[in-house]
Amino acid sequence: GDLSHLFRHALISKSHCCDAIMAVGDHTAEEMHFLGRHFDHHRIELVYNGVPAEPVTLDQRNAGRAMLIDYTEAILGYRPDVLMTHITRPVISKGMWRDLQVCDDLDKRFAQDGRKGVLYILTSGGGTRNPRDVRSMEQEYGWPADHRAGYPDLVGPEVDLWRMIEPFNADHDHVKVVLANQFGWSADRIGRRVPEGMTIADLRNAADVEFGMATYEPFGISPLEPLGSGAVCVISNVCGCGGFVEQVVDGKPCDNVLVADYTRLDRPMGLDEVVNMTAAQRDAVERAESARVAEELLR
């Protein structure tokens, strides 16, 4: 539809008047040319965002894992073998239902070998909850393992997220999902059961897997942040950071970055056929790709 009433669209559409245009991802550069004929003769510079690259020792990684495993036992009652995270904004383009699809397949596979996993989704649609409210929710009903509608707990997009997560947890025994609707990670932000001294850096260092299978993402810094501590980072093929990874590794295989392609079809389809796909057909495509991602993660 018409987006001319949105200030951001209006500004971008006039960017051809600037002395230079920079795009943070390959797809974004292509989209700029798609905006209009004014961009046909403009050179658009590809300038990827930066990714944190602090050195992480094995001791730091093991310490982070130990703290997150202890915390999981405190709130869920078991010690997970596989630690997964997704730190993001609570918007639909982040594709968080795909996380649950992959976890559904992992649950079945873990049931066969006795392993257990946990996924921590750290996102907030209601700002930062203060320590007093955090302690109250933790004591009253075990937040963030459980939730209630209404501030200081679930508000806005967090409500729909929990509507997906709650039935998932009820139906799965080997992978559970924790929705931490908060900014930051420490005892005053997440609760007294967080091990003393644990920070967001420890959460990053602990992750075996970081999800970021967005439906649209100009770049995507967050999905690659745990890469330096050894996590497998799962992104989608529309994420601009995928082009960044390809340039860094010079086209060589990168075992720690797994690219999900949710446009992968089991047979060639024409444009009209794709446009007229039913919801059931689209869901089947997503399910098949999520199963492939789960299989790749366990290779």
Where are these regions (language model features)?
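Catalytic cores of nucleotide-sugar-dependent glycosyltransferases that transfer UDP/GDP/TDP-activated
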Residues: G1-R299
